[in-house]
Amino acid sequence: MRRNIRVTLGAATIVAALGLSGCSHPEFKRSSPPAPSLPPVTSSPLEAAPITPLPAPEALIDVLSRLADPAVPGTNKVQLIEGATPENAAALDRFTTALRDGSYLPMTFAANDIAWSDNKPSDVMATVVVTTAHPDNREFTFPMEFVSFKGGWQLSRQTAEMLLAMGNSPDSTPSATSPAPAPSPTPPG
């Protein structure tokens, strides 16, 4: 019974609301002037994709190959990452050392599905297939973003930080001003 009352009241409310909106007198005039009309809302268009062609896969592969190459010093790799500074060179060297020590080198790369980025239309996204020498982790796929820089391409800072943990890992090399570690006590003998 209660359900029927609710349905009836709900229907009556809807009918009343619709009926009242149609009951205004056609000759009724407002005493105040009509509200000024606002200009139509327009959304600002997204930045259009560049007119230049997308980079060739080889251009992106070259960036990644040089980053993973142990023969290229970290100071020469800084220019391969968006916003990297000379202070990041040591982290880049540690990354390459970790790849070598972990038996991941040599590495090869394949850049697929290259497209303009949805977030920054002047950047490109690519699905990169990384093939390593490591027997247990031979191949993996990772989406990477690249930034146009001085006629070439750089790995985006965000992608570099995810891959290299650059800027998030403390410097593991002792500084010149660090005191030498204390000798461990010798067991009584």
Curated annotation (Swiss-Prot):
Record PROSITE patterns: PROKAR_LIPOPROTEIN
One term under GO cellular component: plasma membrane
Signal peptide region: 1-22
Low complexity bias locations: 169-179
Region Disordered, annotated ranges: 26-49, 166-189
Lipidation (N-palmitoyl cysteine): C23
Membrane topology annotation: Lipid-anchor
Cellular location(s): Cell membrane
Biased composition (Pro residues): 180-189
Record key words, sorted: Cell membrane, Lipoprotein, Membrane, Palmitate, Signal
TM region positions: none
Lipid-conjugated positions (S-diacylglycerol cysteine): C23
Main location: membrane
Similarity annotation: Belongs to the MTB12 family.
Listed name of the protein: Putative lipoprotein LppK
Gene: lppK
